[in-house]
Every structure is written in structure tokens, then in C-alpha cells.
Amino acid sequence: GDVRSWIRQRVGYGSSATALAQRHGDVVAPVRLPTAAAASWTAFALGLPLLGATAAAASAIALDRRLPDVPERHREAARLSGLGQVHAASVLASGATRTWWPASLLAALVSTRARRVLVAAIVVPTLFDWWKVRRSIDLGRFAALRILDDAAYGAGVWKGAFEGRSFAALRPRLTDTESVRALFAGWLGRATSPERAPSRR
């Protein structure tokens, strides 16, 4: 009885996400990330490590350019960028196993790579969060409650989306797109500039 009531409550919370998204827009987006970080991890998940590394490097360079000219600026930019990538991985894992879990599960049923990514998105954050409360709850119970909570909330979000005929609560919010575009535009401009073109004789 208590478990059913709790599940209904979590589904109800998820169902309200559509109305909140329609009222407040991107403020309540399920995932808010810099574009380069999202692109980096998406590329790694798709098995494109070179593209993922390029996006991560673009993120670090864009951050480096925004920092004030202080000693060891490049090292600080690399450190902050690394922390940002870890945070991005955590946010995307949460999105994949919570709000977007029906789509993640469907992908996992037809793709071995998607299955591995989903398992990692479930296992790694679960172990990390359980370790902090390991003295008060065993791993099995913690994992079961976490998965049940995420599944109920995510089901509620999709239920609300279909009932409200709006998928605003499912859309991610990507930030810092302009700086990334400017960075790639600069790279492209240098790569295609006449000075870099091979001379013809």
C-alpha cells in the first residue's frame, strides 16, 4: 500500500512537468548543459571518440578564452573543463535513466552499444550515491528504490507530455551555443584561409 502510494505520487510529480515547462520554459528543462559538453558525451556514447575529444577540447578552449588573464590560466581552464565534463556525464546519465528512460530502454533493446551506455548510466551513479549513505541502507535496496523512483517519475513525465500534447518537458536546454559556433567558425576560417592554402606553381 505504501509503495503503491509512493509510486502514484512520483508519477504525479512527473506528470506535472509538462505544465511547469509550458509555464516556465527552459528553466525546468530535464537537462541543462553547455552544447560542447553534450556533444562530447553524445559522440562518445555513439562510438565516435575522436569527435567526442574534439568537442571536449572545444569546450576547454572556449572556457580558456573567457577566463581573465591570470597565472596558470590554461591549467585552471583545463581543470574547470574537466569538472564540467564530469558534471555533464552525471546530468546526461540522470536524464537517460529518469526523464528519458522509455526512449533509452527502447534504444537498449535494439542496440548493444545503447545497452552498454544505459547500464553504465544506471550502475556508476548508483554506486557513487550509495557509497555516501552505505551505513544506512544496503546496495540492493538502494538500487531498487532508485530505479523505481526514476521509472515512476519518468513515466509520469511521458504521461503528462501525451496528455498535454506537448513535449516541452522532455526537451534538453543547451547553453553556450554561440561561443562554440564562434570557435568552430574561427577554426574553419583559419583552415580555409588563403595563407594556409597550398601554393600552386
Language-model-derived ranges and their functions:
Residues 19, 23-26, 160:
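Negatively charged linear elements and acidic catalytic determinants
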Residues 36-38, 144:
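Alpha-helical membrane-protein architecture signal
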Residues 24-35, 46, 94-99:
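Membrane-penetrating hydrophobic segments
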Residues 43-163:
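Membrane-embedded multi-pass helical conduit in multi-pass membrane proteins
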Residues 29, 163, 167-170:
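Structured alpha-helical bundle/scaffold domains in large eukaryotic membrane-trafficking regulators
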Residues 10-17, 75-81:
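Juxtamembrane amphipathic/hinge helix adjacent to a transmembrane helix
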Residues 1-7, 16, 20:
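Active-site donor/metal-binding and catalytic loop motifs
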Residues 167-201:
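Actinobacteria-biased recognition of intrinsically disordered, low-complexity terminal regions
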